[in-house]
C-alpha cells in the first residue's frame, strides 16, 4: 500500500494552486480556478449530505467532457462516495444497465442524455442533476433536493458565513484500500464489466505521472502551469488519468474540448491552447502521417531529397517543425496509448525525433502498466513496466524471444469486477496476479513489446503463433487501405477484410471500380512480407469503417469470415 493518498493530494493542490486556472470549457470560454473549483466541490458536498449520501454510495456520471463533469468526479471521490463514469458512446440500454447494475443513488448527466431515459427504468436513482448548471432535472420522492439546489447559494452561505477560505478545503480521511471508482469497460468482448478501483490504484497512477520526466532535459511532463487539451473521453481510464487527474494534482490547466475531435476542430484548438502535454490514441498521429506527411514524401521534389543523405536530415527537420507547429508549437511530449501504433508511422516519427512515447495499460490497472520517457523510448515497444509500483512477468519459457501473456501484480491492480466473482476469478489469482490477456515479449530491463491479444492469437497448422494485429499493421500501410481485419476461416486459412480509404481515393481521382484490383495487388505485396505460415489467402472489401469502442479499438467480435463471401 502506498504512503501517499489521492484525496490529500487534491486537498493540497487546491490550496497551493488556488489562484491558478484549473478547468476551461473550450467552446464556452468558461474557466474555473482551483479555488473556484474547490467552492463548487463544497456545494456538491452539501447536496450529498442533504441527500443522505454515505461513503461507498454510488454516483453515476455521463456527459461530454466539461468542467462540471470534472467537478462532479472530484466532489464524489473527495466525499468518499464511488464515482461511476459512463462512456457517452454507450447505447441507452447499456447506460441504463450500468446505472442499475452499479446501484447508483444519484445521476449527473448532460441534458440531452435524459431524453433517452425513462424514470421507471432507473428506479433506484433518487435524483438526477444537470451538468449544465447542477440544477435538478428529476427527483423521485418529494422536492427537497430540488429546493435545496434552487437555494444552494443561501445554503452555502449558511455553511460558510465568513466566506469559503483555503482552510475550508479539507476532505475526510479515506483509506487507500477503499473503492472510489467503478469503471465499466468498453465491452470489446460484448459484455461490460464494472472494474473496482481504489484510492491506492488511482494514487499510484497520479504519483507516477508527477514524476514523469525527460531524463535528458530534466523537463517534468506534468507540472504547475502546464497545459493539456482534453479530447479523449474522460469516462475512459486513460483519458481520465492523464488528461484530468494527473494535471489537476500538480496545478495544471485543463482545457476541455467537449466535442468530437475532428481534425479541423482539434488543430484549431491546439493552436489556441498550445498544450505542453498531448495524450492521444495512435489514430490521431496516424491520420496526420497518412494525409499530410506521406503525400509529401512520395511525390514531388521532397520524395527525391529524402533519399540524399545530407538533404534528408534537413527535410526531416522541416517536417518535424511543421508538425509541432500544427499542434500548437509548445508540446513537450505526446503520450500515446489506448491501442497499438502503426509501425511505419512510429518509425517515421522517431526518425524525425518527434517527442513521442507509447505507454501500455488497461482499465483494470487504472490504467498504467508501462511507460518510458521519450528520450529513452525503444522502437516497437510500449515502454518499461513501472518497477516501483508493479511486478510484471511474461508467461513464457523464454520471455525475451517467445511471446507469452503479460501478468501483473501491484499497486495499480483492481480489487475485482463489481458483483461478478466468476469473471474476477478468471483474471485475478488469489495471490494478486492479474492476467491481462495481452501477449508480449520483454527485455531484461522490463521493456514490453506487445504482439497481440491472447484471444485473437491464431495457432497455425504447423503450430506457429500468428498475431492478426501484426499482419493488419502491414496491410494498413498499403495503398488506399484505411483499416483491415485478419480472420481465420473454418479450414484454418487466413482471410483479410479491408476497408478502402474512399476519401483519399476520391482525392486522387481513383475510380471505385478499380479498388478491388488495387486491393488484390496489395494482398500480393503483403504476402511477400510474411512468413509462409502467415500468408493471407483471400481478401474482401468491407463498405464502411468497422464499428469501434470509445477508445477506437475495432469490435472484432462483430466480424466473422462469413463476411468475406458477401
Task: State where each predicted segment sits.
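Conserved AMP-binding/adenylation subdomain of ANL enzymes
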Residues: 203-227, 234-321, 330
